[in-house]
Amino acid sequence: MIDRQRMIGYNRTVKLRWLDETLDLVLAGMSDADIYAALRERLKDELSVGSEALRGSREKTITLLMRTWVRVPPSLRELRKDGIDLLQGTRRVERLPLHWGMTMAVYPFWRVVADVTGRLFRLQGTAAPTHVQRRVRELLGEREAVARSARYVLRAFADWGVITDSARNGDYSPAPPFPVVDSRLGVWLLECAVRSAPDSVSDFRSLVNAPGLFPFQISRIVPEQLAASGHLEVVRHSLEETVVRARKSA
């Protein structure tokens, strides 16, 4: 894996409603500084209560929220803009794919944990947290930070409602999939998956069946739709092999 894939960055559990609140502030047209101040005020009674530590839990969580929807990496600004455009006419309960996609694109570590979890679901129907953490450590190195951050991501999965406690004590089961019917949203979500992948490239068949997208049931997408987005390059090597690559931002 390239260096970006080995970077963790995701060092707190981000609740879905916090992302919704962040997005509401973005849609209200607030400046970055005002959004940051508003998040500090809204989270003061939930995280680092009574503390003003510069790198406490509240500040680290706000950093994650800001990086996901406000101060995104330059290479992902067009992706963010397209995601916000897709929000028009959607309700809060329909934002899950957008939050998942941006989080995955900004933090590839999220995709790694999602891939491992999704594969376990396909193999055995459930996923034990210890098995997920062990596999992620095998991929990214035997570091305590890797296991700890994997736990943060799994807790976020639970908070977002994409995994549930199974009958087997301590294991997780997948929640019913979220239907993605709008082809524009489906293409955007697949672009997020491509941009989170090593070298921002993926085989088409692997992409549309990506275990890291296990929370979603995406309506059929064909390679031509990805190419038409203007953000993805589609190269057909043979009848059996089609490669999808993210175009570099201008």
List each model region and its residues.
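Positively charged, polyanion-binding regions of nucleic-acid-associated proteins
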Residues: 19-26, 100-126, 182-202
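Basic amphipathic alpha-helical segments that dock to polyanions
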Residues: 42, 59, 63-65, 150-161, ...
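Short acidic, hydrophobic short linear motifs in intrinsically disordered regions
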Residues: 35, 39-40, 123-138, 198-211
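Accessory, usually C-terminal, subdomains that scaffold auxiliary metal cofactors
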Residues: 166-246
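Long, low-complexity, charge-rich intrinsically disordered regions
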Residues: 6, 246-250
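Eukaryote-skewed repeat-based solenoidal scaffolds used as protein-protein interaction platforms
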Residues: 114-125, 129-177
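Short helix-coil junctions and helix-kink-helix linkers
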Residues: 45-53, 134-145, 205-219
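Eukaryotic partner-binding/assembly regions in large regulatory complexes
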Residues: 1-104, 115-116, 127
